[in-house]
């Protein structure tokens, strides 16, 4: 049973501007494991990676129904990849049964969609 669906789109130049103005922006958005991957990327790829993870976490928060705030932070949500390279998403504090995520990039945008199938609160 579907609990929630969320989608988010972000302009890459907005993320690039945030990164140039706030050096700690990636640490606010990314978990330690995500940040470790981020540091290995080229500058161009860093922006795409950060924008994609930002969009995925925003999409998850919308699917969950709370948005990012008191109940859910960027640090509570972690993205990764399975053995085949497919993006996966997990939430640290929440009991999420099944979460599906899709992340995409273009020259100007990053977008993500999340479907939560079952959820225990």
From Swiss-Prot:
EC annotation from Swiss-Prot or TrEMBL: 2.7.8.7
The reaction(s) this protein catalyses: apo-[ACP] + CoA = holo-[ACP] + adenosine 3',5'-bisphosphate + H(+)
Keyword vocabulary terms for this entry: Cytoplasm, Fatty acid biosynthesis, Fatty acid metabolism, Lipid biosynthesis, Lipid metabolism, Magnesium, Metal-binding, Transferase
Molecular function via GO: holo-[acyl-carrier-protein] synthase activity; magnesium ion binding
Similarity-based family: Belongs to the P-Pant transferase superfamily. AcpS family.
InterPro entries for the chain: 4-PPantetheinyl_Trfase_dom, 4-PPantetheinyl_Trfase_dom_sf, ACPS, P-Pant_transferase_sf, Ppantetheine-prot_Trfase_dom
Obligatory cofactor(s): Mg(2+)
Species assigned in the record: Bacillus velezensis (strain DSM 23117 / BGSC 10A6 / LMG 26770 / FZB42) (Bacillus amyloliquefaciens subsp. plantarum)
Signal peptide: none
Protein name as annotated: Holo-[acyl-carrier-protein] synthase
Gene3D superfamilies per the UniProt record, alphabetical: 4'-phosphopantetheinyl transferase domain
Subcellular location: Cytoplasm
Chief location of this protein within or outside the cell: cytoplasm
One BP annotation, GO: fatty acid biosynthetic process
Name of the top EC class for this enzyme: transferase
Coiled coil region boundaries: none
Recorded GO CC terms: cytosol
Binding site for Mg(2+): 8, 58
Superkingdom of this protein's organism: Bacteria
Primary gene name: acpS
């Amino acid at each position: 049973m579907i609990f929630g669906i969320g989608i988010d789109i972000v302009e890459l130049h907005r993320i690039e501007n945030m990164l140039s103005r706030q050096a700690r922006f990636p640490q606010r958005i990314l978990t330690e494991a995500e940040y470790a991957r981020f540091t290995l990327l080229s500058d161009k790829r860093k922006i795409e990676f950060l924008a994609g993870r930002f969009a995925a976490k925003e999409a998850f928060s919308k699917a969950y129904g709370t948005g990012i705030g008191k109940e859910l932070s960027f640090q509570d949500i972690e993205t990764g990849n399975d053995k085949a390279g497919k993006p996966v998403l997990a939430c640290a504090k929440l009991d999420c049964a099944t979460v599906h995520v899709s992340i995409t990039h273009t020259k100007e945008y990053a977008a993500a969609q999340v479907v939560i199938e079952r959820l225990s609160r």
